[in-house]
C-alpha cells in the first residue's frame, strides 16, 4: 500500500529528525517539550506500524526507545516517556487479559523485588488493544499539559507573607510557582545567579516583571545570606531513583547551606522527571560543556598548564531535600520508590 509506505517514511524522517535534535543537545526545548514530542512519536509508531500483539508492540517501542535515549543520555525525560508507554501497554493488555487492577496496584515488597524474575505472556491478540493504548496515551498528553499549573496551584500552601525565598538558576516551574503565590502573598526572592551560565538573571527579570521583589546575588554569597532565608525552592533536571537530584551546577552548594541552617529545601518537579536511574550511571548523569565562560580561550598561557572541566549538573543527595512538589502533590524523598512503582514496571527500568 503506497499510503502506508508514505506514512512509514514520514514517521521515520520525524524520528530521525528528533534523534538528530537530541544529539545536538535538544536546542532550546524544555523537558516538557521533549516529553510531549516523545509521546507524539510513540503514538504515531503504535498507529502506523503493523503489530499482532502486545509483545510485538513492546519490542517495537523498546527498539525505538533505545535509539532515542542513546542519542543524548542526559535527557532522561525521553526514556521516562518510553517507560510510561510500556507501562500503559502492560496495563491495557492486563485489563483485556482479565487481570484485576487491584492485584497490580497493591504490590507487596516481595512482589516488587521478585517481579523481574516473572514473565507474562503477551502473545494473545486483542482487537481493542490499539484504541485503548492510544486513548491512555492521549490522557497522558493531557496530563502533561497541566503539570506546571498543578504544581503552581499548591504555592499558597508553602509560601507565606513576608518570607524570604531563595532559588538558583532558571526554572519555568519554579517561576510559575512563585508567580502564583505572588497573587495573594508578598514576599522577597533571592536568586543565585548560577555561574557560569548566569540563568539566575533571567529568573530575576521575569519575577521582577511579575511585581515580585527580587535580588540577584553571586553563588559565593549563598552561605552568607542563608541565615536570612525562610525557604529554598528549586527546580531540577531529573529526580533519580533514590530520591536524589540531578540539578543545575551550584545546587549542591545551596542544599548544603540550607541543611546547615535548617532551612527547608523544596523541589518543584513534574512526575515526568522521575527516572529509575541511579547516580552511579555516569554516561547519563554527567554532562560537560566548553569551559570558555570559566576560563576564556584568550588566556592562552594559563590554558597550556591546566585542564578545565565545566560540568552542567550537580548531584544532590536525598538527605538534603525536605519535600518534592509534583503535579500529584507533595512527597518526601523516601516515598520516591513508591511513585516509581506506580509509574514504571520493574522490567522496563533498563530499556
UniProtKB/Swiss-Prot annotation:
Localization in the cell: Cytoplasm, Cytosol
Primary location group: cytoplasm
SUPFAM superfamilies in the cross-refs: NagB/RpiA/CoA transferase-like
GO terms of molecular function: ATP binding; GTP binding; guanyl-nucleotide exchange factor activity; translation initiation factor activity
The organism's place on the tree of life at top rank: Eukaryota
Keyword Amino-acid biosynthesis found: no
One GO process term, biological-process aspect: response to glucose
Control of this protein's activity: Activated by the chemical integrated stress response (ISR) inhibitor ISRIB which stimulates guanine nucleotide exchange factor activity for both phosphorylated and unphosphorylated eIF2.
Pfam families: IF-2B
Keyword annotations from UniProtKB, A to Z: Cytoplasm, Initiation factor, Protein biosynthesis
A cellular component term, taken from the record's GO annotations: endoplasmic reticulum
Role played: Acts as a component of the translation initiation factor 2B (eIF2B) complex, which catalyzes the exchange of GDP for GTP on eukaryotic initiation factor 2 (eIF2) gamma subunit. Its guanine nucleotide exchange factor activity is repressed when bound to eIF2 complex phosphorylated on the alpha subunit, thereby limiting the amount of methionyl-initiator methionine tRNA available to the ribosome and consequently global translation is repressed.
Assembly information from the UniProt record: Component of the translation initiation factor 2B (eIF2B) complex which is a heterodecamer of two sets of five different subunits: alpha, beta, gamma, delta and epsilon. Subunits alpha, beta and delta comprise a regulatory subcomplex and subunits epsilon and gamma comprise a catalytic subcomplex. Within the complex, the hexameric regulatory complex resides at the center, with the two heterodimeric catalytic subcomplexes bound on opposite sides.
Family: Belongs to the eIF-2B alpha/beta/delta subunits family.
Name of this chain's protein: Translation initiation factor eIF2B subunit beta
Species of origin: Rattus norvegicus
Lineage, broadest ranks: Eukaryota, Metazoa, Chordata, Craniata, Vertebrata
